[in-house]
């Protein structure tokens, strides 16, 4: 589905006069800015790979997936973006529900997080947990 993305989420932070302290005390806004930052980076990577970035929303069930990465070979990946650890289980559930409802399974599924420096793979689900710091050329 169509979803508008910030070109640079720092513009929103500047317009709202958000400081580090304000963001730490408003995790909801911090989460939106974090998601926008990750989506910006994913869009740049997908453009480099001649792919596309989409958002998924099922209008019947309400299920949403933050990012669908469509590769130029027709494969795709499903990505959830979560700032905090407390949202990872919910993200796993969303990804598994999505996978189980698709005719063609995603090439991979991952959750991009803001709280660790270690890339991990959940042994039960195969879902990767990837820190934002891993998003680099």
Give residue ranges: language-model regions.
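A cross-kingdom feature that marks ATP-driven nucleic-acid transaction machinery
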Residues: 1-137
